[in-house]
Amino acid sequence: MKALCMIRVQPGQVDRVLEILKRKRRVSKDVMVVSGRADICVILNTSITDINKIVIDLKNIKEIVSTETLIEVEVDLGW
C-alpha cells in the first residue's frame, strides 16, 4: 500500500525534522521538502499497519505541528 504523509513543522525546523526522519529506519527514503500547506512530504510504501505505526511515531516529534496522510485507493478506471 502507498501513502503520502504531509507534515507541517514549526517555523525554522525543517532541517531538524529532516535529520530526525533520516535516522528513522521505517520512514521511506522518499522525503521531500515542499511548498504549500505542508513543509515536508514522505512517500510510504508498506502495509497499512506499518503506515499507522509510522504516522503515530511522527506525532512524538515535538517539532512537527501536524500531519495529514493520504492513503492510496485502488480504482478501476477501465483504461
Map each language-model feature to its residues.
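A compositional/biophysical signature of low hydrophobicity enriched in polar/charged and small residues
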Residues: 1-79
